[in-house]
Amino acid sequence: MTTKKPSKGGKPSRGQAPNKGAKAGAARTTKPGKPLPGWFPELNEGSAPPRGRKARGADAAAPGPAPGRKLPPAGKVIDDPYAAREAEKYEQPIASREAILALLERCEGPQTAEELGARLGLTAPDRAEALSRRLGAMVRDGQLVQNRRGGFAPIQTLNLVTGVVIANPEGFGFLRPVEGGDDLFLPPYEMRKVMHGDKVLARVTGIDHRGRREGSIARVLERGMTRLIGRFSVEMGINYVVPDDKRVQRNVQVPPDQTGGARDGQLVVCELTQAPDSRRPPIGRIIAVLGDKLTASLVVETAIHGHELPFEFPQEVLDEAASVPLVVEPAMIGDRVDLRSTPLVTIDGEDAKDFDDAVFCEPNAEGFRLVVAIADVSNYVRPGTPLDEEAQKRATSVYFPGFVVPMLPETLSNGICSLMPKVDRMCFVCDMQIDRDGLVTHSRFYEAVMNSHARLTYTQVWKAVGEDDAETQAWMGDLLPHVQRLHQLYKVLSKARAKRGAIEFESSEVRFVLDNRGEVTQAGMLVRNDAHKLIEECMIAANVEAAKYLLSRHVPAPYRIHEKPPETKYADLLEFLKEFKLSLPPWSKVRPGDYTKLLKKIRDRPDATLLESVLLRSQSLAIYSPENHGHFGLALEAYAHFTSPIRRYPDLLVHRAIKHALSGKPLDKFTYNAREMAALALQCSERERRADEAEREVDERYRAAWMEKHVGGQFDGVISGVTSFGLFVELDESKVQGLVHVTQLPQDYYKFDATRKTLTGERRGSSYRLGDRVRILVLKASMEERKIDFRLVEHKGEDEGESLPPLPERGKPAKRKKEKY
């Protein structure tokens, strides 16, 4: 693995050597015995003079006003309530930070250092220099921001954007606003102040040459990364870690006494002890050595460490979990509705262990009665307890092939909370009346006790109702009519879904089978059938009723919102569709049904998978919010997550909110106020994204591990991405994606058309575009780098007899050249 050189900040401090060539005054040194200026300690704040102003020597002329601006009258020097503290601290004190902030808040706009100096009576060269350094320190500490004209303003008085930093391996990044809206572009020099995942305040500085809003970092609110995975390296006596995550652009320097016994080249877990800034790299210490090589057995462990997933439960949490009863005793039931004789069943995957939901359906004069019974986690996990605090911290269970990082200890998630068959369990019920058009006409929520009559799988249900398999039907016995009625209800709900225009994306999830060493032995696509969709529609119905009930009772709760596509993304989508002679309505008029119509139109095309993927990527991200904004994808006016409290904290919050409304207690007696619920909704959204990233990383590594076994093999696929450096190809059967580098195309000079997404040879005229079918040869796969390289073997329309370039030396693909941003 190629390693980066230590970043500049990783070198020994220049302060260790004498500064022989420094000019008088520039280094701010003093002669022996001469007392330091009273403001000299401000230099320890580590800030250079503010941008746009050079340090002046002691004999420099007094600063003047900024060009084109009238200098405000000094008047009376403002009262400084902290003057005594400053006088005690410095021999020649200047205005305190508090006084500077108070003055700026009274000004009509940003003030330059010269204007502030005039107002504060600090116009002498040394006093002006001291003020300049203090202002620089306040900018560094996030108390002030400085605009391009050199004016300073308090952060809270400016229109700043709060968001999360999303880094790009090329060095630049984006700020994803927490309030939604378009991202801010962050150039490389701004990205040196932050790391991927940091929550920051930023200000919009202008529009870049591509028409994107550009921003600068004003203050880091919360560090998003406290540890990372990487290769430990030693170069010229300096220890550092090269991050495995290429979005972390700077190597982490490791002090000699913090190496944890790691050797050069080993894979390690590094805990960050000091954040980076524009001049210094991050500092860290080694907390675990994973080994010399990333093996399949380490893939999940690496993801857990790299994404900082809470893995082990604190002892106090385990102690509380151990005190929870293992069975439901008669005395615990109280006045709960008794559903134990109702033939509720669970329907899940073969490998499921935690059973959140059970369903029952019966026909009646008005249509159908649907009972959705959900594990009553809120009965066991109470607000403010160690169990609740840990569940809140995790916010979601994380699912890897063959392994789960649960939100709750297994004694609850796989035990007393899980709706296992033939045992009594506490549940929280949404009982619905559904008419023959698939609309819920009435619903009610109540606490109950149930006894699942069977643990069914999607495969069993599909065989019984979809394939009419006699053996499966006989095995189900008395439950078969109930399952058939559920399938009848599904057809009704499915028609209602189609009528309202909900988007129907066909999922293509890859499932891996591992042996006891963690090696991938099998990979295949998860096939969704009506059994999956049956449960999905039942859960959606209950989720909608939960959202409606909460809205009617005005109880703070996290809604699951999915807004229409961002306008800029949608504009790009329209341009893309033009190349395929397809279209959608303008952004202001687009509805979910428009997507559905287009998906039906392209379903039989050979490039349908690619087009569907592009349509999916154009969508907004679904998040949790204390305010209901509806769900665009499902074409619903209100939506909340109610059905999975064992594995999702928002569902637990929704249960608590509904129960509070049912109790009839005043709103001000609810555990959470609106502000607290907003903070929890944001945290749950962030934790969900973290889990998704961890699951995606493991998926990518296992895909690469699977393709390592097929190096030299040939496969058919479709071009899923076109760039200036090559083609991305998605294989038909496994959905694995790899790169055909331009060096693995027929020899030519290739021109990339960013608008049409094509790569065209100037001499031969060969053209490659999105959706083209190709045959590739697997050239190389690296589980550690999460990269798969292909070589083009056949392209539809390509002239026969075209010579392909020879393989690069030792079978390695040519080095990818970084594109300028």
Where are these regions (language model features)?
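Charge-lined substrate channels and their catalytic hotspots, especially those that engage the 3′ end
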Residues: T2-V371, S378-V423, R455, Q460-K463, ...
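Acidic/polar residues at beta-strand termini and the immediately following turn/coil
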Residues: N147, P177, P243, D435, ...
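A short macromolecule-binding patch
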Residues: D182-P187, V248-V254, K735-D753, E802
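A structural feature that tracks compact, well-ordered secondary-structure segments
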Residues: F185, F728-E730, L779-A781
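Intrinsically disordered, low-complexity linker and terminal regions at domain boundaries
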Residues: D198, G206, G215, H741-E784, ...
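A generic structural signal for residues embedded in beta-strands
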Residues: A202, C270, V722, I776-V778
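Electropositive polyanion-binding surfaces
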Residues: V269, A275, V300-T302, G306-L309, ...
